[in-house]
């Protein structure tokens, strides 16, 4: 079955994946990373997209963000891609595409599923062995350090699920640290990544049904083969 067209709905958090062309590195050093977060902040601010979490890996970027109006996420990602590609190509004397086609994304159900997606992003560049040391240097170029109470590279808009972890910043950071230390079950991780790659919403059957009614689009795979004769 062909991949469903990418869906974006204002007001819902989206898990976004940007990958380097042919698996190539999109960051050679921290100068590149700083240039990227600068371009990211500019693009999201211009198009009014709230950023909840981010992780810069060697060949890809994970973002968790919420567009406030329809079409804003797509515009922000296009602007980000063009802006950073120009800087990267100029700095490294290269030409051609930096990214592997269009960005991939999934709409994430609010609640525990959304909090789990945020943990997934923060774990992407976190060394689990160092999380308990409270050393922010062990979590470079991700929002993990901010969710643990340290300064970060990009301003964040915390989701309600993070605020619900405790009454004080210390309580929230402590509760989040526990989650960051826990490994995501392989099946849950696979479901989340598959949802991103196939552009399908990630959540319960009730959530998907609600989105289908809201968007008037089929969001679940149909049965294979021809329809049964009646």
Where are these regions (language model features)?
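Short Pro-Cys-Gly-centered "Cys-loop" motif that presents a nucleophilic cysteine in a tight turn
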Residues: 1-57, 66-230
